[in-house]
């Protein structure tokens, strides 16, 4: 796992984790463990380290971490704090130190004080047999702060109702993560 700012990466997943034993443990779905000479941690919004298994922002540091963004001191100060590169990625670390990427922090929806990661909701919606594509966003909600709203594109010759999509999601994920509303559209903007 890495990004340009972590050039080239801070975690690695060995080929042995793709074999049967690693698959049984689910480690083939991870982004690996910290590489030699690198450190990775997961923190909350106040940069406090989270317990293993809790989702937060993934931070990395090591010899390849950037020195800064060219002529962008404010962006550099926001990204590099306390010697750690704040990736903007949300994920968790398991008890063995394997990192599991979940989403982008900025895509997180906060509904009723609960963190909802868009990718988890989108995966649930996408598993509905009538759905070709989908996207979810947080929309303002008077009571909850934000509510999950879904945009769905149906497969040619298929149809679904908002109620069907919501009921399908309730079978896949926790109720507070399910969309409260669904808009059906012809296509998602792609760029």
Q: What would you call each of these model-derived segments?
A:
Residues 62, 67-68, 78, 90-177, ...:
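AMP-binding/adenylate-forming catalytic core of the ANL superfamily
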Residues 40, 134-136, 182:
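Generic structural signal for residues in well-ordered beta-strands
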Residues 4-99, 105-108, 121-122, 131:
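Conserved AMP-binding/adenylate-forming
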Residues 5-6, 188-191:
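A short acidic, often aromatic-flanked loop/helix-cap motif at beta-alpha or helix-coil junctions
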Residues 10, 180-181:
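Extracytoplasmic/periplasmic beta-strand context in beta-sandwich domains
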């Amino acid at each position: 796992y890495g990004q340009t700012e972590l050039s080239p990466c801070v975690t690695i997943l060995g080929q042995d984790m793709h074999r049967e034993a690693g698959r049984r443990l689910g480690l083939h779905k991870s982004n690996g463990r910290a590489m030699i000479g690198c450190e990775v941690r997961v923190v909350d919004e106040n940069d406090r380290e989270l317990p293993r298994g809790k989702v937060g922002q993934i931070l990395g540091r090591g010899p390849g971490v950037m020195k800064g963004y060219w002529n962008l001191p404010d962006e550099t100060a926001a990204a590099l704090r306390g010697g750690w590169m704040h990736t903007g990625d949300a994920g968790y670390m398991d008890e063995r130190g394997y990192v599991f990427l979940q989403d982008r922090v900025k895509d997180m929806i906060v509904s009723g004080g609960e963190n909802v990661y868009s990718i988890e909701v989108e995966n649930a919606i996408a598993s509905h047999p009538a759905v070709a594509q989908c996207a979810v966003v947080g929309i303002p909600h008077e009571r909850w702060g934000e509510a999950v709203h879904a945009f769905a594109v149906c497969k040619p010759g298929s149809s679904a109702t908002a109620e069907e999509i919501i009921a399908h999601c309730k079978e896949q994920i926790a109720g507070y993560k399910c969309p409260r509303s669904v808009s059906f559209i012809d296509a998602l903007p792609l760029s």
